[in-house]
UniProtKB/Swiss-Prot annotation:
Protein name (database record): Uncharacterized protein SH1982
Residue numbers binding a divalent metal cation: 146, 148, 177
Stored InterPro entries: Fumarylacetoacetase-like_C, Fumarylacetoacetase_C_sf
Keyword Methyltransferase on entry: no
Keywords for this protein: Metal-binding
The keyword Metal-binding is assigned to this record: yes
Family: Belongs to the FAH family.
Length: 301
């Protein structure tokens, strides 16, 4: 399943993509009419949280089948052209990111890979697919992109052993880890340079892990104005997904809806010769196999 959150007619909702169509089942409406018992989650985060006691996907499947068979299915579907994409989920706790997790990317920025490099991004930096984000020209002329595979946590845990790590994943998404390279190079921490308004585009969907069975062998392609800048594969990650979850959870309790960005391959603007940073009016597209394409626009003014 591909889950998303959206605005429609000034109201926030969430849903699941209609198969083979650019449309969404509005799950707030579907559950209100066809949900079993009291299972009426109002947000995707609520659904993920309840997944610890109920099978959220199975509840969605049953409700959507009932809507499909009701004779009024179109009342519960909305075309993508009519919605504004939001971040699929806004984590109440953690947006955690890993840097230097691809050797070629670390090398292009002249960084050594000696140990895990971990930072957080402010939840206020999250934005959805097709968003226009500020160009931040008032503070930097070195705005950069980083296409990444994102992990969405599906159940709570800490000190998670590597052998069980994948059990704690609900699904995967796409993240563009927008970075102010000027601030990053001037400061001893990454939080500020990584937390600009609009600095964490995410989406368009969360794809459940059953639909992405080999997340460590998917292509990541980033284009700026249709020019390919990054063309990598998650098989190039130094620390694999289970390694990352095991290491984080030694120190940080993970909860449903938490996001983990797993690092970016080579080809960022700062690593090109000469550097090519994002400019007002640019279009950035990050595509990952079996998830989709995340599009971000840099404001002209």
């Amino acid at each position: 399943m591909k889950f998303l959150s959206f605005n429609y007619k000034d109201a926030e909702s969430y849903g699941v993509k209609v198969k083979r169509k650019d449309a969404v089942w509005d799950l707030k409406k579907v559950f209100a009419e066809f949900g079993e018992g009291d299972f009426h989650p109002q947000t995707l985060l609520e659904g993920l949280q309840q997944n610890q006691t109920l099978d959220f996907q199975e509840q969605v499947r049953k409700a959507v089948v009932a809507a499909e068979d009701s004779g009024k299915a179109d009342e519960f579907k909305i075309a993508f052209n009519d919605i504004e994409f939001l971040p699929p989920v806004t984590p109440p706790n953690n947006v955690i990111a890993f840097g230097r997790n691809y050797q070629d990317h670390a090398s292009e920025l002249n960084h050594e890979v000696q140990r895990l490099y971990v930072f957080t991004k402010a939840a206020s930096s999250l934005t959805g697919d097709e968003s226009t984000i500020p160009n931040h020209k008032d503070i930097t002329d070195q705005l950069d992109y980083e296409g990444e595979l994102g992990i969405v946590i599906g159940k709570s845990g800490e000190k998670i052993p590597k052998a069980l790590a994948l059990d704690y994943i609900y699904g995967y998404t796409i993240i563009n880890d927008i970075t102010d390279r000027k601030a990053q190079n001037e400061q001893d921490q990454a939080f500020l340079s990584k937390s600009l308004t609009g600095g964490c585009p995410m989406g368009p969907y969360i794809v459940t892990k059953d639909e992405l069975p080999t997340p460590e062998n998917v292509n990541i392609v980033t284009k700026v104005n249709n020019d390919i800048r990054q063309d990598g594969n998650t098989s190039q990650m130094i620390n694999k997904i289970d390694d990352l979850i095991e290491e984080i959870s030694k120190y940080v309790a993970l909860h449903p809806g938490d996001i983990i960005a797993t690092g970016t391959p080579a080809g960022v603007g700062a690593g090109l010769q000469p550097p090519q940073f994002l400019q007002p009016g640019d279009e950035v597209k990050v595509t990952i196999d079996n998830i989709g394409t995340l599009t971000t626009y840099i404001a002209k003014d």
